[in-house]
């Protein structure tokens, strides 16, 4: 990691259908091997399924799902003397978003539905209702941080 300069953050363009920057980041995370049009098809297909099932706009459901998955606190390893402590620290907003997106997609990929579009829509619906593996992952991270609260004075 460079000590002199931190990398410049690139500007992410909003997606063409909804004009949402977070949705573009989500699509970029779904994308494999540079196949953006395939990723767009998967995400937009999932949002259409959500719209059909909930009879409301898919964007609020997506945003609620992401909000329910984003962690506020996590543990980081800190070596003191010979021991390694799991120290709870607050998560920065950019990392919160990145972790939320990553967990949603990995939870969707682990599901049993037939196509990725169906898996993603089901996981987004579950997450927006406070269920699903992505929300469980966040709860586990929060529980871990709570269990290691005694080491919070070792913060950076």
Swiss-Prot record:
It holds the Pfam family Ribosomal_S7. One of its GO terms (molecular function) is tRNA binding. InterPro entries: Ribosomal_uS7, Ribosomal_uS7_bac/org-type, Ribosomal_uS7_CS, Ribosomal_uS7_dom, Ribosomal_uS7_dom_sf. Keywords: Ribonucleoprotein, Ribosomal protein, RNA-binding, rRNA-binding, tRNA-binding. One of its GO terms (biological process) is translation. GO terms for cellular component: small ribosomal subunit. Gene3D superfamilies: Ribosomal protein S7 domain. SUPFAM superfamilies: Ribosomal protein S7. Part of the 30S ribosomal subunit. Contacts proteins S9 and S11. One of the primary rRNA binding proteins, it binds directly to 16S rRNA where it nucleates assembly of the head domain of the 30S subunit. Is located at the subunit interface close to the decoding center, probably blocks exit of the E-site tRNA. This is Small ribosomal subunit protein uS7. It comes from Rhodopseudomonas palustris (strain BisB18).
């Amino acid at each position: 990691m460079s000590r002199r300069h931190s990398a410049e953050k690139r500007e992410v363009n909003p997606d063409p259908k909804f004009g949402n920057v977070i949705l573009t980041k989500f699509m970029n995370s779904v994308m494999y091997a540079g196949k953006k049009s395939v990723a767009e098809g998967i995400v937009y297909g999932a949002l259409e399924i959500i719209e059909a099932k909930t009879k409301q706009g898919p964007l609020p459901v997506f945003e609620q799902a992401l909000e329910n998955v984003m962690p506020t606190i996590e543990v980081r390893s800190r070596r003191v003397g010979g021991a390694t402590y799991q120290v709870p620290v607050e998560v920065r907003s950019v990392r919160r978003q990145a972790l939320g997106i990553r967990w949603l997609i990995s939870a969707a990929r682990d599901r049993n539905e037939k196509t990725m579009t169906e898996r993603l829509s089901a996981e987004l619906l579950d997450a927006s209702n406070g269920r699903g593996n992505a929300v469980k992952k966040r709860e586990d991270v929060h529980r871990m941080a709570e269990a290691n609260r005694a080491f919070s004075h070792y913060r950076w």
